[in-house]
A protein has these predicted regions:
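Non-catalytic propeptide/linker segments at domain boundaries
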Residues: 1-36, 46-55
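Chitinase-like catalytic core of GlcNAc-active glycosidases
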Residues: 28-43, 68-183
Length: 183
C-alpha cells in the first residue's frame, strides 16, 4: 500500500495578484503639538484669546469648546465664531474645534442611542464637518466623557467614520482620552 501521494518536497507557489494595498494617509505634524483648551459658554470673537495667551510661549494649537451634542439624532449646538478663528490664525495658531458631550446642560443625550445609530453618527459627522468648513477650523478635537461600556464599540465606530471624512478633507482629528473609572 502506498501511503505517499507523490514526491515530497518544497513547492514554489506564485502569488501573483493585481491587488495593490491602499496607502493609509494621515495628517501628521513634524513638530510637537502644544495645545491649550478654551471653555466657552457663548460665542467669543477672539479678543480674550490674545489676552489669555499673553506671556505664554510654544503654544501652536488652541481648542475652543464650540460644539455640543444637542440630541440623539446627531445635531449639535454650535457657538463658533469666525472672528475667533481668524484671530487665532493671525496669531499663528491652528484651531481645533472641540466637540463635547457633557457641557450642554439642556441637552438630553444618551451616548448609546446616539452612537449606535448609523444615521445619527452620519448626521453628527456631517454637522461637524460642515461647521469646521464654514468657520475655517483646522481640526476637530473630540472630548466625549463618561462614555459607558455599552456605548464603547459604537464610540470607536464613530471615531473611525469621522476619521475617514477628516482625512479625506485634510482636517486634523484629535481625541481626548480619559482614564477609565468606575461610575
Amino acid at each position: 500500500e502506498n501511503k505517499r501521494l507523490g514526491n515530497v518536497g518544497p513547492v514554489a507557489i506564485d502569488y501573483a495578484s493585481d491587488f495593490t494595498e491602499p496607502v493609509f494617509t494621515n495628517i501628521k505634524r513634524d513638530y510637537k503639538i502644544n495645545m491649550v483648551w478654551q471653555q466657552f459658554w457663548s460665542a467669543q470673537d477672539g479678543s480674550y484669546l490674545r489676552e489669555g495667551l499673553k506671556g505664554t510661549s510654544g503654544i501652536n494649537v488652541v481648542s475652543p469648546t464650540v460644539f455640543f451634542l444637542s440630541d440623539n439624532q446627531g445635531n449639535i449646538l454650535n457657538i463658533a465664531n469666525k472672528n475667533y478663528v481668524d484671530t487665532a490664525h493671525d496669531m499663528g495658531l491652528e484651531v481645533w474645534a472641540l466637540v463635547s458631550n457633557v457641557d450642554e446642560p439642556s441637552a438630553d443625550v444618551n451616548s448609546k442611542e446616539l452612537l449606535s445609530s448609523t444615521t445619527a453618527r452620519n448626521t453628527l459627522c456631517n454637522n461637524l464637518i460642515a461647521a469646521v468648513e464654514e468657520y475655517g477650523f483646522d481640526g476637530i478635537n473630540v472630548d466625549f466623557e463618561q462614555v459607558n461600556m455599552q456605548a464603547g464599540e459604537d464610540y470607536i465606530q464613530f471615531i473611525r467614520e469621522l476619521s475617514v471624512v477628516c482625512r479625506n478633507k485634510g482636517i486634523v482629528l484629535s481625541v481626548d482620552n480619559y482614564v477609565p473609572t468606575e461610575y
